[in-house]
Structures are given as structure tokens and as C-alpha cells.
Amino acid sequence: LDPANAALVPRAELLLYAAARDQHADEIIQPALSQGTWVLCDRFTDATVAYQGGGRQLPSATIETLNRIATDGLQPDLTLLLDLPVEEGLRRAIGRNDQDGTAHEGRFEAETLAFHQRVRDSYWQLAEIHGRFRVVDASGTVAVVAGRIDRVLDEFLAERGIQL
């Protein structure tokens, strides 16, 4: 993610993410699911569709094939899309990177607003296609957004008859 890797071509970026996702699925996700453990994942195959497909404009068929190979077809039961206008999301990401010392991971943050709008549009297209998506308004304080997420999770669990 280091901006120093600016010469990394989009297809190589896609392959690196697919390889990382494959390793993550094999080492972490599948063993946990096999033990009946719930898995929460910050970004998964939808991020590849949005960033490398929408943002980088790589062919969706290629991305779908790589995602399927990397995860053995694993799909989440629920996907939370924390949505913000592009400018606000980018401002927050840059601020977070500066605050936690990961400003060197700013490759995506250095992209154009048009890139980020394509990413957001791609996420919205996924949300319209897949019923597992719940869109959460991410504007407001951390506490406000957390409350919105809590309500979505409560509804999701109630729909499945799960009580915690």
C-alpha cells in the first residue's frame, strides 16, 4: 500500500490482494468457521470488486474468478457498507493514516476523486445485487455510527432467531 510502489500495475495489485486473501481464508477464516466461530472481516472480496474493478477498472470476470479461487467460493452472510460521500471518506482516511502513523500506506488515498467515486459506485452496485448487504450511514460520531451498526446487527440476528 506504500505510495512508493506507484509503478505497481493494476493487474499485479489484483494478484497480490488475491494471494493475501487466499492465505487469510486458509489460515484464519476457514479454521474458525470449521470450529463454529463467527468471523468478522474488515474488507473481503467485495473490496477487490470495488477497488480493483470499479477503481482500477479491471475486468469483473477476472476479479470474480480470482476471488472464487482465493476463497473457495466463501461468501459472507452479512456485509456492512459504511457509506459516506467520497470527499468525507477520503478526508477521514487521510486523517486516520496521519493519526496512527500509517501515512505511508496512502496509495489509495493518493488517487483521484474520480477513482474514489468509482469505488463507491461499485460498492453501491454490489449492495443492490446482493441481499447480504446492509448500508449504514457512516456520517456522525463514532458513537452514532456504532449505534446504527448495533441496530443492523440486532435486526440481522433477530431475522435468524439468534439471541446473544
Task: Outline where the language-model segments fall.
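Alpha-helix boundary/capping detector
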Residues: 22, 26, 43, 77, ...
